[in-house]
Amino acid sequence: MSKHQKFYSNHSSRLQTWDYSKAGYYFVTMVVRNRRRSFGEIRDGVMHKTPLGEFAEQSWKRTTGLRPSMNIWLGDFVVMPDHFHAVLRIGVNEHNSSLSLHNELQTPGQVLFALSHPKNSFRPQSNNLASIIRGFKASVTTEARRTGVDFEWVSRYHESIIRNAGDLNFVRSYIQKNVKRWNG
């Protein structure tokens, strides 16, 4: 253990055996640093977005147009006061066709097979989930700086691989009810 490992954690929370350019459904959460409520506030069960919150929503909606070669589908998403949740699907495309299982939602057996056969090549992080998130976060950060808003994302993001229709339905329900459940 290096002398700094006990103070700093820089290991990835990503599933090491999964290729995030692979066709599949993903649930992502991005959080504003220090949980600052930069995107708005919730009053009486309704999210009232700031201009930056509105920009974040519009920026997310532009994702598919900015990356047409990735065959992205945007599912449910929600802008919350201090974070952002979204479901997206990366479809089979020119960047992942040799890696894909060619299934929208995979069976547990297919997922286990994919997890036991990790990719073993190093390459730049482009045309994958990380590049989508990086582009979105950069867009929102750039707008915040342009408009003088004191804003910063947490450097990482949380993701879950959605493995079946039950998981997808659970996540969709979670996102749809998020504003009503808010007790911030």
Label each residue range with its predicted role.
Residues 1-184:
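Short catalytic/metal-binding and nucleic-acid-binding patches
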